[in-house]
From Swiss-Prot:
Region (Disordered): 1-132, 201-276
Biased composition (Basic and acidic residues): 75-95, 226-245
Protein name per the record: RRP15-like protein
Source organism superkingdom: Eukaryota
GO-annotated cellular components: preribosome, large subunit precursor
Keyword NADP set for record: no
Species of provenance: Drosophila melanogaster
Amino acid sequence: MALLTEKRVKKTHAPASDSSPEESDSEGSQNSASEAEGNAGWADSIQKVLKTTKPKTQKKTVLARAKKSQAAVRFQKDAANKKPGFDFEIEKADVKEEDEGDNHEDEKPQASALDATLTKQQRKNVPLQLRVKPSFRDMERERTLRKVATRGVVQFFNAVRIQQKDLQQQLEEAGPLDSRQDAVLNNINKRKFLDVLMSGKRAKSTPVDNAVKKEEQETDDDDEDKGSSGKKKSEWSVLREDFMTNKKIKHWDEEDDDEEGHNDEADDSDYDDGEE
């Protein structure tokens, strides 16, 4: 029985082995045929893509647009937002503090840029802010200041000229010896120059802001204010309240009578002379 079973198994395996090379030959021939023919669908699709014309309104070509597909964009966003992994854990409070610190660092350059622009604007506006519109009330003060300035400059140059003349004269008197000339130069004193400067004809202290004149102006202003509160000074004398009580016009009618009497007497005398 064992021998019969072995013979049957050999018979079954034998045709299988015979059929395998035939099948392999058929598969190889099909593969070679497919390689020779190629993929017709792929060739057609590539041909259509190559034949497509580029639209005038669109700058990018078909193949270049494929780079910006949704999948590629998502992948790039994920890669950008992806944080590096760490072996340790970070507490939430620390993360918030770091985020706040990053925000402050981001805000600092903006503030510095604003400060720079503000400083530039302020520098441009500084000359405009220093300009002051002159007032007619300050004209006299400006004139006095100009006079004082001119006098001071003239006095200063006169003092320098006098000092130079004195020094030249002393050097001539000292002679050609260097030791004597050095002694003369060492005797130059700052105090002497100031004495010469303050002893000139124009060396007079002129008060620019006169306190007495200011007080007089203030009193005049107060009087004007009082007069404006009541009645004006340049008012007709008849309209004043003390017109009738004034001593000068108290006996105005008597004076007129006396004048009329004198006039009548003069007329009578003239008339008598005419009759004679």
